[in-house]
Structures are given as C-alpha cells and as structure tokens.
Amino acid sequence: MRPSRRAPDELRAVSLERGVVKYAEGSCLVKFGDTHVLVTATLEERLPPWLKGQGRGWVTAEYGMLPRATLERTRREASAGKQNGRTVEIQRLIGRSLRTIVDLEALGERQITVDCDVLQADGGTRTASITGAWVALADCLNWMKARNMIKGQVLRDNVAAISCGIYNGTPVLDLDYAEDSEAETDANFVMTGDGRLVEVQGTAERTPFSQDEFLQLMALAQKGVARLVDLQKMAVG
C-alpha cells in the first residue's frame, strides 16, 4: 500500500493553470499533489554570444526553490554565492527537454528564458517543472504569434516528465516525498507527446533493478506522460 493510498499507476492530482503572472509573456502554475511550481517564460531580444548571426534562437531555463518550499528552511543560493550541483543539473535538464521540441530556426534570433520557482516541494519538482514549463513556453509563443513575431509551428510536440520507482517491491508512478525517500529504485522519464524518450534518469537506491523492472517503470511512465500531455493540451486550449 502506498502512503497516499493511490493505485500503483495513479498520478497525484495534477493541475496546470496558464496565464497566472500578468507581466510574463507566458506563465503556468503547475501542481503535482503538494508539489507546486510557478513557471514563467520571458522573451528576450538577445542571444548567447556564440549564437549570434546564426539565424536561430535559443531556449534556456533556470530553477530554484523558495526557502520554505521544504519542511525546514533552505538557505537561498544567492546568499551562499553559488548554485549547488542539483540546481544546475535540473535547470540544464529543463532547458534540454524544451529545446528538443522547439524549432529554433522558426523562433528567430531571440531567446526565451523559462524560470521554474518551486513554491512547495513534495517530490517530483523537476518533473513538475518540465511539464509546467511546456505550458508556459506555449503561452509565450502564442503571445508572440498574436503579435506577428513568429510564423508557422515553432513547437514541434509536447514534452512532459514523470517519476516512477519501486516502492515496497512494486513499480509505482509519480512518487511523492514519502515514497521517494523510501524507494528501492527511482527514475525520471522525460518524453514527447508522441511517446519518444528525451531523457531517462534512473538510480537503484537500495536494490539493483532488472531489465524487466525497468521496462515496467517505462510502461508506467508512458501512461503517466500521456495523461500529462492531455492536461497540457487542455491548459493551452
């Protein structure tokens, strides 16, 4: 039995609310159960120096957690003077995931920066961030299209992410913190709307897992991502 009493293949309650920040070109408040992330997408008429003059744009991401997103206060990274390794890893993952489904040439020589700020953390902050980031990005691109700044289909597909793991010997979908901290195995799957893999992160925390168990986790992830993609499409209309 899962602590949340969910079925093994059951997502937490998920919501994706678009257009929640009035100043941002795109925004989304994403909730995976008690994990809440505010995502904004900002259009910038600038590019990294190494991209200038190449006729294509760029999508990048930043990630952070509010000090009381967790049970005990976490020191702000700004006060420490540097980002920790986990933060850097996650924001690079978010940026990579988004770029796989964006036509950077169609975007033109401009950059979209996606900021993911964790308001409350209960497991799965990176997967919630990626899922909400797609909505904020789509919101931003719709804003640009309404102003004739872009033409055609800049977004090639959806992208969403979900965690899976083996908890008490059972493969389960969408781990919350209580499950993640006790899981024998946990993995994060990033997938496109048509089911292709973007990235897989998997770790045996206590017991090595077999190929069959991995395939069971991937099957759960495919089911979960398909549901998330449906919710993304509903959110952007």
Swiss-Prot record:
Phosphate binds at R86, G124, T125, R126. GO terms for biological process: rRNA catabolic process; rRNA processing; tRNA processing. SUPFAM superfamilies: Ribonuclease PH domain 2-like (SSF55666), Ribosomal protein S5 domain 2-like (SSF54211). It catalyses: tRNA(n+1) + phosphate = tRNA(n) + a ribonucleoside 5'-diphosphate. GO terms for molecular function: 3'-5'-RNA exonuclease activity; tRNA binding; tRNA nucleotidyltransferase activity. Keywords: Nucleotidyltransferase, RNA-binding, rRNA processing, Transferase, tRNA processing, tRNA-binding. Its EC number is 2.7.7.56. Phosphorolytic 3'-5' exoribonuclease that plays an important role in tRNA 3'-end maturation. Removes nucleotide residues following the 3'-CCA terminus of tRNAs; can also add nucleotides to the ends of RNA molecules by using nucleoside diphosphates as substrates, but this may not be physiologically important. Probably plays a role in initiation of 16S rRNA degradation (leading to ribosome degradation) during starvation. It comes from Rhodopseudomonas palustris (strain TIE-1). PANTHER family: EXOSOME COMPLEX COMPONENT, EXOSOME COMPLEX COMPONENT RRP41. It holds the Pfam family RNase_PH. It comes from the Bacteria. Homohexameric ring arranged as a trimer of dimers. This is Ribonuclease PH. Belongs to the RNase PH family. The gene is rph.
